Amino acid sequence: MMQPIKKIAILTGGGDCPGLNAVIRAVTRTAILKYGYEVIGYKFGYRGLYNNDFVKLDLDSVSGILHRGGTILHSSNKDNLFDYQVEDENGKIVKKDVSDVGVENLKKEGVDALVVIGGDGTLTSARDFSRKGVNVIGVPKTIDNDLLATDVTFGFNTATEIATEALDRLHTTAESHHRIMLLEVMGRNAGWIALESGIAGSADVILLPEIPYDINKIVEKVKEREEAGKQFTIIVVAEGAKPKDGEVVVSKIVDDSPDPIRLGGIANKLAIDLEGLIKNHEIRSTVLGHIQRGGNTSTYDRILSTKYGVKAVELINSNLFGNMVALKGNKVSYESLENVIGHTKNVDPEGELVNTAKSIGISFAD
């Protein structure tokens, strides 16, 4: 028979994302007000679990954070306790499985269940801790919206709204100066932000990781617009977009990261390439970057994050561990962590949204 739950912990891992604080708030308030649990939060993700570095969470500590971006618990995207950098007896940095330290720290603090908020990498470790007997509940987080097991991840709506507003602003300057403007948005393997903001922000060309582009098709679109009396063109490009028979643009390699290859720079490269093909327009590129992650959280994401946080605690109370909360249609449900890891949700090149965009004249340069 399961022991009654008295104390739970929360940690946030991976890149920051609008809605993290809303989840922390919802978990804490539900745990205290509905079930009478004690709540702590580990700082800087799994690093805090390894170092047993935590703070007590109560109603006061989560007051006023619903709208705020980032995470009051801080985060790290470099700390995998199953492959963690430590110093050996010779002072050499080596990678080692130190997950047992995390398990022991949970036991030492009397933590009965752990809520892990993160993307694929963070949730992979959550699954692995579940396999070691830890009572884990996952909450999916990524602005890329690329987790297959849930219809929507929190943070995506906010990021898309920010990208859409950026496109709105670029329109006025592009039209004033007859420029071709490129906006680079996040989207390593999945182009959801570029696709949805491109439709909502009235882009002329959308470039996605899922649809390799032909630069000559972009030139054709610019000429088509010129012939229609439009002397400017707006292009939104996901950071993972690449030309046909080409490669993605890598900005840097982070050796101590579980995900060392960092993309970025495709908009600037494409602007340079286009300058050699289009002579009568200025071409400018803008990288939206981490602006997509920061600032206040949208209304939709505040509500979705709150629903996720409440559901996470309800799963704990029902002893339904080893699961991740997920949105299915309009209902928050759950899915086994064993089934969600490594399964990404990519844009379907033949899907409804791509068809919608093409039907209103948007080019994918394919």
UniProtKB/Swiss-Prot annotation:
Activity: how regulated: Subject to allosteric activation by ADP and other diphosphonucleosides, and inhibition by phosphoenolpyruvate.
Binding site residues for ATP: G15, K78, D79, G119, D120, G121, T122
Highest taxon, organism lineage: Bacteria
Enzyme Commission numbers on file: 2.7.1.11
Residue ranges crossing the lipid bilayer per the database entry: none
Main location class: cytoplasm
SS bonds (residue pairs): none
Binding residues for Mg(2+): D120
Site feature Important for substrate specificity, where: G121
Pathway(s) where this gene product acts: Carbohydrate degradation; glycolysis; D-glyceraldehyde 3-phosphate and glycerone phosphate from D-glucose: step 3/4
One Gene Ontology MF term: 6-phosphofructokinase activity
Subcellular location: Cytoplasm
Catalytic reactions of this protein: beta-D-fructose 6-phosphate + ATP = beta-D-fructose 1,6-bisphosphate + ADP + H(+)
UniProt-annotated binding residues for substrate: T142, I143, D144, R179, M186, G187, R188, E239, R284, H290, I291, Q292, R293
GO terms under cellular component: 6-phosphofructokinase complex
GO biological process, one term: fructose 1,6-bisphosphate metabolic process
Lipid biosynthesis in keyword set: no
Record keywords, A-Z: ATP-binding, Cytoplasm, Glycolysis, Kinase, Magnesium, Metal-binding, Nucleotide-binding, Transferase
Cofactor(s) the protein needs: Mg(2+)
Active-site residue numbers: D144 (proton acceptor)
Family according to the record: Belongs to the phosphofructokinase type A (PFKA) family. Mixed-substrate PFK group III subfamily.
PANTHER family per the UniProt record, alphabetical: ATP-DEPENDENT 6-PHOSPHOFRUCTOKINASE 3 (PTHR13697:SF52), PHOSPHOFRUCTOKINASE (PTHR13697)
Job of this protein: Catalyzes the phosphorylation of D-fructose 6-phosphate to fructose 1,6-bisphosphate by ATP, the first committing step of glycolysis.
Subunit structure comment from the entry: Homodimer or homotetramer.
Name used for this protein in its record: ATP-dependent 6-phosphofructokinase 2
Gene: pfkA2
